[in-house]
Amino acid sequence: MADSIRALAERHWNGDGDLVHEHHPVAPVLDRQAEEIAPGVLTFVSIASVSAVDTGDGLVLLDTGGSFDADHLYDQVRAWRPGSNVDAAVFSHHHVDHVLGLGRFDAEADESGRDRPVVYAHADTPDHFRRYERTTGWNAAINQRQFGLPPELFRWPDTYRYPDLTYRNELTFTKGGLTFELHHGRGETDDATWTYVPELRLLHPGDLFIWAIPNAGNPQKVQRYVSDWADALRAMAATGAEVMLSGHGLPIFGAERIVAALTDTADLLDSIERQTLELMNLGVTLDRVIHEVTVPERFADLPYLQPVYDHPQFIVRNVWRRYGGWHDGEPDHLLPAPRAQQAAEWVELAGGIDRVLARAARLADDGDLRMASHLVEHTVLAAGDHAMAHELRTSIYQRRATEHVSSMARNLFAHAARASEQGRRDLAARDERPSTSREN
């Protein structure tokens, strides 16, 4: 028999669990398990977590999951409270794994002639939905890479359930005998909402807490807000919550544990941003910054702060982008020649493709996969149809994927390996023609 959600939460708090593979917080590893984890509170765990709160006068959903979970969520909620209407939902932010699960609840309301659930969200959420509608191709490509999704099977959604009521800083509503306090914070997104229900001492942080190093650096996504994130975590820690419903992964039970998890996460974020800004204030290049910022040792063994999704170096890059813009400080990167042209020049200087491939293979054999990656990319850029170059590229990136804990890094490397197996650099790109340009 599978462990209950509460039992799994206890195991993972004590460091007795596999958050890299078996119970990764951003993967459907619990087979859409649902459980009443506190009186009147059902938690559904899949890629993202959803909770339903029974107010005594209807249900309130805290997030709604993705479209891929919508039927399962509906069935679990209906099995738990078959006669209770879903009257409201709170979107913690605009990401599609949190906002696309209301369809059957809306349809149920329509069929019975009552109002649809009222959706609460931050005032910036609709703008993000409109951004998504303008960038469906881009978001399909980057998520295919990030999650290892087959391009032929994954499409980015182009319709969204827009909120009915939005707020700017704080909003409180009551339902039944319960109070839902909505607070704005900036973190993974600029439209984050964390919710506190004081009567239950119940905290819903959304993706401000995900049982991992925060998703504060994601290499393909829009700006994250590291210092603001830390502020929101400390504000949540001050609530005195006894149950925290993580945006991904498992709940945390007990006020002391919740305070520890939130403040440790805030301290980690503060450390990364402080170190990054100290180096930036010396006027150094991004290359120095990403290789000199370190994660303090005191966080190394905390089970809820492992780099199983994002990576600390990605967070450093995001801090740089927020305070320093897109330029990395290297003058030749300001108005560069196309990469394929650069690669061809370097390969020629090195004595040709075969010599570069031989050196890349030796580096890989010696365990220097980072440098091997740089060299093999030059060969594929210089001669895109070179079979041996793609064969070596496949091998190098397969090895890089296996050596990383971060699933973002693993999946991006694995995507490159799969592409080279098919003689391509990128399976998600629908146009792989090399860039050509003249200097203006």
State the predicted function of each range.
Residues 59-60, 66-68, 127-184, 228-240, ...:
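Metallo-beta-lactamase
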Residues 1-22, 138, 238, 251-440:
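Accessory terminal helices/loops
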